[in-house]
């Protein structure tokens, strides 16, 4: 009878906060909307055969006691994911081109669209951060009906994946069709000078930041978890960071190419 009451109470009140916020998206991890493997891929993936063989060789060469081996084993989590979540099936990748066009859309689309889409996108990202931005999460858990029934805050990023293509389409439409006939006021027409400036500075800014991350991302993003830093010896941690940084740079380079081609077109 007691068990039944407890079960009923739990169902009525929803999930406890700790369980609900367990799958909270990391703040920097949000950038994998643009660069997919910024924090790795699926936590269920295994490293490449070459990577696994190298790790095994390093452990066999350097680990000399069972105590050291236990510490190393405790330090290893997922080789292919190093974000804030306990595990993931993969990043919430939106696409470099879509993100770039969405960014432009916030400058080109009509104000009646851009402000509410921008506001909804920001709110969605703050909610996806969960325990990493408790001010918003606590309010929604305490005051928004049924919100505490959802398990993973990160899943709300699906809203952004709908809003970004929407603002991108609205922005592109106005970019190509804004003239005296389509606009209600002459001052609302997007001038060629305005379009060129926005396109130029947006491209330079986004490509510049991505290029900086390609060069200095190892010190900015870390590429390791707190658990790995605590338990893994420096030679293993450095090897993991180097391998992960190589993976990141491949995706960052692809993003630069895609954005560059899109901007040029």
Describe the function of each predicted region.
Residues 1-105, 218-256:
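Periplasmic/ER-lumenal interhelical loops and adjacent helix-loop junctions
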Residues 109-265:
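Contiguous transmembrane helix-bundle modules in multi-pass membrane proteins
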